[in-house]
Amino acid sequence: MPRLGAHLSIAGGLPRAVDRAKASRCQALQIFTKSAGQWRARALPPEEIALFRAQVERTGIHPVVAHNSYLINLAAAAPALRAQSLAALGEELDRAESLGLQGLVMHPGSYTSGTEDDGLRLIGDGLAALLAERPLGRTMVLLEHTAGQGTNLGHRFEHLAEILERVDGSPRVGVCLDTCHLLAAGYDLCSDDGYEHTFHELDRIVGLDRVKVFHLNDSKKPCGSRVDRHEHIGKGCLGLEPFRRLLNDPRFAGLPMLLETPKLETPASKRRSDVDPWDARNLRTLRALIRTP
């Protein structure tokens, strides 16, 4: 069976995210280790790191992964932005390492000049340099397959394969698949044939063994739209059947499958629970789709 979970808030400190995950009956967890909309990050106090790791151990929630800042763009051609992006990603990788996280999910980037190939080269070379600077690192970099908005890279399996080739197939680089992004990028998950063809192609081009995490999101937009708009499970263009197939696919048994669906926007002063009602509803929907042995 997959390990279900969600992306949860770190408001109040990193250990509070683990509290929220436990209250929400999550088996796995994704967090930001800093504000996703800022370059700078506060230093993590040793006592907060220790408490977070103890909370994870105590609750048995695993794996825990982080998602990187949306500002980072390794495909940027401008030297200043590229240098800032490399430094920021390196810092986030170090933070994830200190917290004992399995992986750091990252959007590959958007090329700002030149061609797709130029952008993929910059991403791959940048990642290779960051990994070489951290030869003893254990936290994986997880390339997230994207919807392909604008000049975003990573929406074709071939893009991921090219980046992996540029890091010499490092075992420290894996893949995160997002169901909304797959559909938006043109991969048909809605029919039996489309589902099987999608994962056959992924295996042929990238390798199923590279897949370490799934993001489970329905899509507000149809197949091939290349528009990234997440929707609640079963309420969008995917419907329930693709999730039923995925949750019961033995090739992905045991992998974390994490919600990034919309939250109920409730002011902090009015919150009475660590459990987001929409997360709870979406998790119940997913659990009901899992076939019991």
Regions found by a protein language model. Give the residues of each.
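Active-site acidic/histidine proton-transfer and metal-coordination neighborhood
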Residues: 74-174
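Alpha-helix N-cap and loop-to-helix initiation/capping positions
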Residues: 40-48, 76-88, 114-125, 151-159, ...
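Histidine-acidic metal/acid-base catalytic patches
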Residues: 161-293
